[in-house]
A protein has these predicted regions:
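C-terminal ends of transmembrane alpha-helices
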Residues: 26-31, 58, 129-143, 190-208
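N-terminal signal-anchor transmembrane alpha helix
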Residues: 7-37
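Membrane-proximal helix-loop-helix units in multi-pass membrane proteins
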Residues: 119-164, 168
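Terminal transmembrane helical module of multi-pass membrane proteins
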Residues: 157-247
Length: 247
């Protein structure tokens, strides 16, 4: 049983993050470019500062533009890579937290740690569902549904990180240094949530400046990279635990 749990908490997250990162890089390299008339921006490549990650997952480019003269290019290759990777992230997150509670029960950790791990599992399953939903509904297929999944994915992730940190804090086997890493991520995530809910709104029919766009785009990429780093830190912690337990 411990080998199965180790796979879902250590090996699978590493495999998934690697695949997702590679999918994003390839999708960005083959992205046909975009045109944002409201700020006078046009390119024939993917921009780290001017294109959202969700644009990699769109069916066509420039679907948010009102001007019908702007060409909408097919984006199927990038869409399949990015959305496929994002769905995999969601599924892995669900499997990670489904097995998260099992490890604390299996090693007979503290009663508080076991209790909070069960609550964490439920929120983790919900977060994974929302992330998979972002990939299943491209923003140009249904913008409202896509934004709903994306916003609630990050909102749920905030509460998930808090519960995860509490669970590890009460653990008799996991070092509290892993709590510090996740708490730091919670703070960064809180700042990002303020940006997406109360910052400049970017979308079809919205009026925004180039700096507004860059703020949202860079913030999005920063939180995704920080999230992957936070997960890998937890993976390392579990790997250390499993090695000690195995020995």
């Amino acid at each position: 049983m411990i080998k199965k749990i180790r796979f879902y908490l250590v090996r699978l997250p590493i495999i998934t993050i690697t695949i997702f990162f590679c999918c994003c890089v390839i999708a960005a390299l083959i992205y046909p470019g975009s045109h944002k008339e409201i700020i006078g921006y046009q390119s024939d490549y993917y921009s780290f500062t001017h294109n959202f990650l969700s644009e990699l997952g769109s069916l066509k480019t420039n679907t948010d533009e009102i001007n019908t003269a702007i060409i909408q290019k097919d984006n199927t290759p990038s869409m399949l890579l990015f959305n496929g990777g994002l769905i995999l992230i969601g599924a892995t997150l669900m499997l990670f937290y489904y097995n998260f509670k099992k490890v604390f029960a299996f090693i007979e950790d503290s009663s508080k740690s076991i209790f909070y791990s069960k609550i964490t599992m439920l929120v983790g399953l919900l977060a994974g569902f929302f992330y998979a939903g972002v990939g299943l509904v491209p923003h140009d297929l249904h913008f409202g549904a896509h934004v709903f999944f994306a916003n609630f994915a990050f909102l749920t992730l905030f509460f998930l990180c808090i519960l995860h940190s509490i669970t590890v804090y009460y653990s008799n086997f996991l070092n509290n240094s892993y709590v510090i890493g996740y708490v730091a991520f919670c703070i960064v995530l809180f700042v990002y949530l303020r940006i997406i809910f109360f910052g400049p709104q970017i979308g079809p029919g919205k009026i925004y400046s180039e700096s507004d766009l860059m703020l949202q785009v860079i913030a999005q990429k920063s939180i995704v990279l920080t999230f992957m780093a936070a997960i890998l830190q937890q993976v390392y912690g579990f790997n250390v635990l499993f090695k000690k337990y195995h020995n």
